[in-house]
């Protein structure tokens, strides 16, 4: 029984070490919402957070609703307190996807881009992170 428990524990840690955690980032966006019916009023400021994944060409894939209409966007790596300014390069609200670019290329040090595949089959195993 102890051997089985040890094997299960080791396999869980082995699985966790294969997860691409250094590809997942946290996204912070600031949106100001102007009231056009009462333009003399100050706009309401909203702070939104979400997650994204580093993809090829030093870009970040995220949900469009996280950055749609944002005046300011920052990204942060896992286990790093520093935030980096980012810009929305492409956005499609129809499919709820956006691609960000980070202005400081040092952000991508010690990260690995996720590989996107088109070869997905029914019943393939999938892990969601972020």
Give the residues covered by each predicted segment.
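Sec-dependent N-terminal signal peptides
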Residues: 4-13
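Short, flexible, glycine/charge-rich loop motifs used to bind or transfer phosphoryl groups or to couple energy/partner
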Residues: 15, 42-43, 88, 116
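N-terminal activation segment of mature serine protease catalytic domains
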Residues: 16-54, 59-63, 72, 121-129
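Conserved active-site neighborhood of the chymotrypsin/trypsin-like protease fold
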Residues: 56-129
